[in-house]
Amino acid sequence: MLLAIGGWNDSAGDKYSRLVGDSEARKKFVEQAVAFLEMYNFDGLDLDWEYPKCWQVDCSKGPDSDKENFAAFVRELSEVLKPRKMLLTSAVSPAKRVIDAGYDVPTLGKYFDYISVMTYDYHGQWDKKTGHVSPMYHHPKNSDPGFNTVGFLIKLLLALSS
C-alpha cells in the first residue's frame, strides 16, 4: 500500500514549490515521510503534485526552478526509500507543455519506480464538441494538432527518457 500526497486540490498554491526549493525542507520532509511510512507499514510513497512549474496546469504560476528542484527532491527521496525496499511513484501530467516546463524526464525516469501518466480528460465539457476522453491517436477531423493523444505522449516520454 502506498501513501499518496498531492492531487488537484492539494496542489493549489506554492507549498510544494517552497518545499522542493529549500534543501533543508526537503531533507526534513524525507526524514519525516520515511518515519511515517515505516511506522504505518506503507510500501512506499506516491507523489501527485499537479504540477511542478505549471501549478494546476497554469505554467505562468510557478518558477522555472520547480523543474530542477522537483528532480532533486525525487532523487533524494529515492536514495532513502530504495535501500528500504520502498516504492517511489508519481502521477504526472499528459500535457506536452507541462512535461516540457515541469519535468526532467530522464532524471524522473531514473528515480521513480513507476510513473502513472494521467491520460484522461483530454476532452470534456469545456470543449465545444464531443471528443474521446483518452484518445490513442489523432483523428484527422480533430482540429487539435495531435498533442492531446496517448500515442503522442508515449512517444514523447520515450524520446525524452533516452
Give the label of every model feature segment.
Residues 52-162:
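Substrate-binding surface in catalytic domains of secreted glycosidases
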Residues 1-37, 65:
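Glycan-recognition patch characteristic of GH18 chitinases/ENGases
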Residues 21-39, 96-107, 152-153:
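Short, acidic/polar
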Residues 1-5, 45-47, 88-90, 115-117:
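Hydrophobic faces of well-ordered beta-strands that scaffold small-molecule active sites
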Residues 16-19, 46, 136:
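Generic hydrophobic, helix-prone segments enriched in Leu/Val/Ile
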